[in-house]
């Protein structure tokens, strides 16, 4: 029995459920997982989305996702999202004319645990810092098969909130 989906089946699945659940695409090293993101971008369904460039999670560090912004007058701080995620004061949940965002997180399981923790609100809640992604936004992740021994791992308690496909 074949437990693997074709590229077009994976793209169809993401298009169908990606705005409600994050899909993680697992596949062999070099098989073209990131190319699926570019296939998604071309679908008419995503024509009005802001499709950001795929983000290599292994290259993220402190401040790559959001930075603190101090409001000394009110004695508070806020989290300002990095522009690479497509979220801003003028493009966020609840703001008229905001466009949904298509985000691809590449090599998610290879990222250091603290980066996975920082990315968790994006993956599970469609939120960067304090700003929610506009309705219809899609987050899709890509990683290698854990059996390849390339250091890819996602903790079990986090796996049950995601849709995994191969």
Residue locations for each model-derived region?
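AAA+ P-loop NTPase catalytic core and its hallmark functional loops
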Residues: 1-166
């Amino acid at each position: 029995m074949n437990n693997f989906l074709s590229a077009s089946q994976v793209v169809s699945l993401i298009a169908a459920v990606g705005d409600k659940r994050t899909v993680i695409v697992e596949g062999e090293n070099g098989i073209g997982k990131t190319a699926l993101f570019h296939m998604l971008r071309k679908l008419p369904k995503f024509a009005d989305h802001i499709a950001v460039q795929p983000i290599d999670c292994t290259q993220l560090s402190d401040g790559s996702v959001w930075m603190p912004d101090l409001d000394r007058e009110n004695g508070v701080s806020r989290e300002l999202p990095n522009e690479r995620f497509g979220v801003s004061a003028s493009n966020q949940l609840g703001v008229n004319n905001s466009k949904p965002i298509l985000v691809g997180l590449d090599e998610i399981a290879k990222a250091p645990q603290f980066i996975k923790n920082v990315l968790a609100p994006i993956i599970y809640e469609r939120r960067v810092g304090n700003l929610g992604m506009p309705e219809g936004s899609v987050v899709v992740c890509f990683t290698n098969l854990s059996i390849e021994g390339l250091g890819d791992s996602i903790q079990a308690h986090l796996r049950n909130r995601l849709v995994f496909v191969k």
